[in-house]
Amino acid sequence: MKMNLDKLAGQYLEYLQYQRHYSIKTIESYNRQIKHFIYFLNQEAITDYNDVNYLMLRGYLTKLYEENLAKTSINHKLSALRSFFNYLLKEELILDNPFLLIESQKTAQRNPDFLFLEEMLDLLESIETKDDLGVRNKAMLELMYASGLRCSEVVNLQIFDIDLGQMILLIHGKGNKDRYVPFHEYARDWLINYIEEARTSLMIKNEGHNFVFVNKFGNPLTNRGVEDIVDRVTRHYDPTKKIHPRHSFATHLLNAGADIRTVQELLGHENLATTQIYTHITKDHLKEVYLYAHPRSRENKEN
């Protein structure tokens, strides 16, 4: 019967891949969460998903806490398993979904780290461009800040997705949703510099693809590769923050008065609530400036 648990899990992962067109990275994550739960079921001698109930899930939740998992990690598991059981219910393989009775764990909302405009410009100017990889890093972070790109979108960007004349990118976002995003002349100049010189030099070792950003061997950068570059560059500038150019992009647009719906479209957010995180940041910034600059506020601080 154990094979039945695994087999149904495999069917679900195929459904995500071929019908929902989820990314490989997302499918691998779902696979890990489901396997972890199947291991728990095996320990409890459960051989049928229909035997999973609310009390059992409370026990599973306790086990997750005993493993010292963060609440965000626990919520990630619950979300994946809730979706899996919804699939089983839809396919009439189970009678109900007990995960609907389990609430997500409350977490303290942490606003994304960002840099003020002057800081962001300083960071970009601090990037060394003495060699091909430095030019690549400069072009990549300039573009990420210019267009608010995710790391995965940088990875998937290909030469024919870039219109240098119109300064427009065709971005292949989450859930296979495409969008067009503009970029400015400064980012274009660095992009041209990188594509015509640094990338050409790096691609001598590998000419079999059209991906824009490559490693020292000419192979396309991976998600981890882009994340490492961003982390290395930003931590060199400010080791106290986990900075992403995308967060500063959104914050700076909203601070300058951009319409939130437009920012939502540029970021490729499905839900407006996700974009609204950045309005909280701008409110904090406005309050900070107010407390510092308003004469009455200064009086109170001095007294």
What do the PLM-derived regions correspond to, one by one?
Residues 1-303:
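Conserved catalytic core of the tyrosine transesterase superfamily
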